[in-house]
Amino acid sequence: MDDRRTILMDRYEIGRQLGQGNFAKVYYARNLTSGQAVAIKMIDKEKVTRVGLMVQIKREISIMRLVKHPNILQLFEVMASKSKIYFVLEYAKGGELFKKISKGKFSEDVARRYFHQLISGIDYCHSRGVYHRDLKPENLLLDENESLKVSDFGLSALSESKRHDGLLHTTCGTPAYVAPEVLSRRGYDGAKADIWSCGVILFVLVSGYLPFHDTNLIEMYRKIAKAEYKCPRSFSAELKDLLYKILDPDPSTRISIPKIKRSAWYRKSSDVNALKSKHETGDKVYKGEATTSDTTECSIFEGNRASSRDKVYTNGEATTSDSPECSNSDGKQASLSLPNLNAFDIISLSTGFDLSNLFEERYGRREERFTTRQPAAAIFAKLNELARRFKLKIKKKENGVLRLVAPKEGIKGLLELDAEVFELAPSFHLVEFKKSNGDTIEYQKLMKEDIRPALKDIVWAWQGGQHQQPEQSMQGMQGEQQPSRLPSQQPQG
């Protein structure tokens, strides 16, 4: 029997893997001093730096240190070695709320209790100027007492991220839960967008399926834009009324959290014991400042400057640790490959999926997109290879964007194009090329004669125009976007 233990920083014993994403793995762990169970998210510095996501990691740390609430998953500490960043998180023994829903819908009493906790946590976030922007059942965890914990703040925004118009402008989130104003690519109020997502979650809790769904993604987005959905007959009148006010396509008239708390359905008493009960339809259509310190950031994120003795950060204070890496008790370094940030912007990307024409006049675009089944690392490797081949200079930008610059000036100066990778599913990505400077004809020629042929071995389908393969593209996306997803519509019979 193998008695070796994996010990991290002389502080935590690492156990089984709990989850995995593109850039991180999450492990169950135990504090060696207190015996407390925790979850440790292990992130590879080099990988996230290479794809321009370090700013997102920093933001997630800042936000999680800013929000302390019983219904928010707690970040206990951040540690670092030369090559890795470790988030020590509260362990949610009950797992994802999504897994519970996938076994069957909840009664309104059970759903109400979870919804109370969700609204409480989100209301607190908003009071601190934090907007989650990726609320969905997969990001809602349960502890051993069935208490809800909002997690995964990788796409969250702080109020200071707003532009001069007071609105956020980054398209984030998971399509089925995203508010219409976010899909429109216009500025939006982060609080109002979160409220919409809470409404979709509430519908899912009580029905067991998504309110806005269609085998055709464009049609699904049209339904979201018009807030067109159907409630089962089993829904109470009070619940239907609340959903109608939350799923209001106009954010200016959408119900606020204080009014949600005063609604008849919300104020009904929830039987705590209802959570122990079993999960249990013509339809009506409704339209309806505690951030990471400078010292911490320097040491954690600038791995090349780290000393041979790693620093452990607890509540912003740095202490030293003699254990530079995660190692086994026999002295050998544990092999922990790390590719989870919780998705990039995954909507309104290709011509076929773009909803902007539902909201505004469409103008000529200078963008080309393709889908691929290759992992992110392979995509970026291919883009770097392509740049070397055609002597394009690479300028890295934030959030997984590479700027490619032509070696010589053209008719309208240097031709520049941005290549951005979006994750649609763990093994399904969309890559967008967008001209940011230079002559359009030169850009189109470069794409047609050089870039497209060079990418043919990783392209699954080009999106939009004559290159698109509509049925294959749409069906492939639909099939892989939400694996083991909730039922898409009300069961028959």
Curated annotation (Swiss-Prot):
Gene3D superfamilies this protein is in?
A: Kinase associated domain 1, KA1, Transferase(Phosphotransferase) domain 1
Q: What class of enzyme is it?
A: transferase
Q: Name one Pfam family in it.
A: Pkinase
- What is the E.C. number? 2.7.11.1
Give start-end positions of Polar residues composition bias.
316-332
According to its UniProt entry, the function of this protein is described as:
CIPK serine-threonine protein kinases interact with CBL proteins. Binding of a CBL protein to the regulatory NAF domain of CIPK protein lead to the activation of the kinase in a calcium-dependent manner.
Task: State what protein this is by name.
Answer: CBL-interacting protein kinase 26
- The scientific name of the source species is Oryza sativa subsp. japonica (Rice)
Q: What is the lineage of its organism?
A: Eukaryota, Viridiplantae, Streptophyta, Embryophyta, Tracheophyta
Give the gene that encodes this protein.
CIPK26
